[in-house]
Amino acid sequence: MTFYDHTAIEPKWQAFWADNHTFKTGTDASKPKFYALDMFPYPSGAGLHVGHPEGYTATDILSRFKRAQGHNVLHPMGWDAFGLPAEQYAMDTGNDPAEFTAENIANFKRQINALGFSYDWDREVNTTDPNYYKWTQWIFTKLYEKGLAYEAEVPVNWVEELGTAIANEEVLPDGTSERGGYPVVRKPMRQWMLKITAYAERLLEDLEEVDWPESIKDMQRNWIGKSTGANVTFKVKDTDKDFTVFTTRPDTLFGATYAVLAPEHALVDAITTADQAEAVADYKRQASLKSDLARTDLAKEKTGVWTGSYAINPVNGKEMPVWIADYVLASYGTGAIMAVPAHDERDWEFAKQFNLDIIPVLEGGNVEEAAFTEDGLHINSGFLDGLDKASAIAKMVEWLEAEGVGNEKVTYRLRDWLFSRQRYWGEPIPIIHWEDGTSTAVPESELPLVLPVTKDIRPSGTGESPLANVTDWLEVTREDGVKGRRETNTMPQWAGSSWYYLRYIDPHNTEKLADEELLKQWLPVDIYVGGAEHAVLHLLYARFWHKVLYDLGVVPTKEPFQKLFNQGMILGTSYRDSRGALVATDKVEKRDGSFFHVETGEELEQAPAKMSKSLKNVVNPDDVVEQYGADTLRVYEMFMGPLDASIAWSEEGLEGSRKFLDRVYRLITTKEITEENSGALDKVYNETVKAVTEQVDQMKFNTAIAQLMVFVNAANKEDKLFSDYAKGFVQLIAPFAPHLGEELWQALTASGESISYVPWPSYDESKLVENDVEIVVQIKGKVKAKLVVAKDLSREELQEVALANEKVQAEIAGKDIIKVIAVPNKLVNIVIK
């Protein structure tokens, strides 16, 4: 049996593509464009895993398909290379994070090239390259000029032992840091913020203009969290102080019996009475030790302290005690709520715990037993009595505005983006703070502001980043002699990934972020493929920056990514014992088709789980490429199932894909190729061209491969293979298995040219229709012959053909034919005597 040698074929064609710049982006203005984008990876020390190539293979198939269809294709790759792991490694080993990052990138690039992806490497970007982050910094200066980047004192998660603030995501549920397990305290610190809230409505509205999965759009809508309601102002009794509450249910104001402020609310100290001061101070201290997540947990016991003061309910003049409680966050809404315990579960639990009034204002339910949270007509509500929800809200807003104690208000759950990190390995923020109290952005002519190389990258311990220790970089003097200090915080990893898709369009431009004409030519991105875990943050931040750049006239489109596709996760093979605990693969043995624990002998159940080092079920693509070849890996990952499904890795499936490619190789290299078309494969060939073309376009790669298999099976039944069909088939399989595609194309054509730009095959609609039909001939009700005849033969012609058949003639010899019943396209029934 003939098998192809992937170890010879694959490196040969990879070298050919590199030497000939086969995938250089086309610039012929008369052609349509296609921009296929992968979410670029963080180049970790671990290298690629088999999950990465799934999305990369999908965009690569589309890119190869569109090139063959005559498009200019932009298909680039780069590196999201700033980030904590490199910094941590550098701190642990004393090495420069830049060196570690460069080594990782080289390894990733080697692995990616071994998989045969058609990237235009002339457009490679690296977020840690000063020539790249010059423009990240330039965007920041534009945000600063527009008032969209500002400094604010905000509560952060401070870890004294690490000497830095950490993100909410890095705080464990027990209130300690993910790294090191140290105590985390909430502490106000000067931070850079980006005013993403200024774009909330547009970020919401423009989701209608993009072709994204509805689930991702919903996640963004929920994150933005638009609410329509009213602001209500409450005066504090016997003071000149007041506070504002936002509520989506101003119609329930008659049922508001107490108010709650966040412990951090600016008014707390001013309105706390002397006899409550100690309890309030103690409670504030306790609250600062909890994360926002822990504070707002619905299941937790309600805690709070009375300030000693009362607010006046503006609609009925009643006194409402003012409490502080940690379930109200200073960063959400106004940091104050009016509590309507009869109709809100959390307020009801709080009121029951602290013996506060509960007054029902909606009909229905028994508020002594539980909060009534459904809709009902208004009661105990003065001028709102008898009204439904919508009418009552409108009437109350009208009253609030007429009385000057409130107004209609739209709010968003979205918070401004905390943009600074007390870290070394990130883009320096291009701002100088002068001793006269002013701050200015570094002028464009002095960008990039290069990250200084330093061995001392441990946190400074002062709340500033390690850059505070690099005094010769830090301290500057203006021409007029005024001294200043550079901003020491760096940007988060999100910064470089918020605009990288723009730089691919014009990666070597030293004068501007990218040329306007080129941006006009290539935007928006036609297909963006990546994991659903980036649904909110990365995609929201990129959309925000894009809209700012649109307002500045830099980009010509409102949205960056026209179509988004989330590939599923490739799960590892894992095993569970009877308790449901996962067992590492090196502790499992297979006997007679079942799996057993090596140490206990217990029979185990096979179950898919996320690949992890601890389960020892991570599959390295290098091993797969070595054993089976890159084309096999590509075909297998596309054939596993729908691209958006999460599916378990299977060695058997991999072997099946390799066997299929061997059959393809044998078909083209050992079957006699002829210039004469017998017509036997007309239908299946044209069906295959049609199906593969449509299914690749719809990203249904698994069904496209299934149709290629149908063709191979049909072609193997024939003695010869028509040359045009052989070539067309090789073109169809080439985007999936590009190395094999190139090899077989040369075997058929000896052209010396890559298959990449050979026009995509077309199909003949007329050949999709069956021209022949099989009919049965029955004698005395028994089938005696089956005939293939032209479709739609008349009764007379059908009868003639049937009676002329040798088998039929042998059956009727010497017999009397009483009648012949012919049913076109179905059967002939002969009645004899």
Curated annotation (Swiss-Prot):
**Keyword Membrane included in the entry's annotation:** no
Which cellular compartments is it found in? Cytoplasm
Q: Motif 'HIGH' region in this chain: where? A: 41-52
What one GO molecular function would you report for this record?
Answer: ATP binding
Cystine bridges? none
Could you mention a single GO BP entry for this protein? leucyl-tRNA aminoacylation
The record's Pfam families line, in alphabetical order, gives: Anticodon_1, tRNA-synt_1, tRNA-synt_1_2, tRNA-synt_1g
Cellular component annotations (GO), alphabetically ordered:
cytosol
**Enzyme Commission number(s) of this protein:** 6.1.1.4
Catalysis performed (reactions): tRNA(Leu) + L-leucine + ATP = L-leucyl-tRNA(Leu) + AMP + diphosphate
User: Which leading EC class covers this enzyme?
Assistant: ligase
Q: Where is this motif: 'KMSKS' region?
A: 610-614
What family is this protein classified in? Answer: Belongs to the class-I aminoacyl-tRNA synthetase family.
Protein name in UniProt: Leucine--tRNA ligase
From which source organism is this entry? Streptococcus pyogenes serotype M2 (strain MGAS10270)
Q: Gene that codes for this?
A: leuS
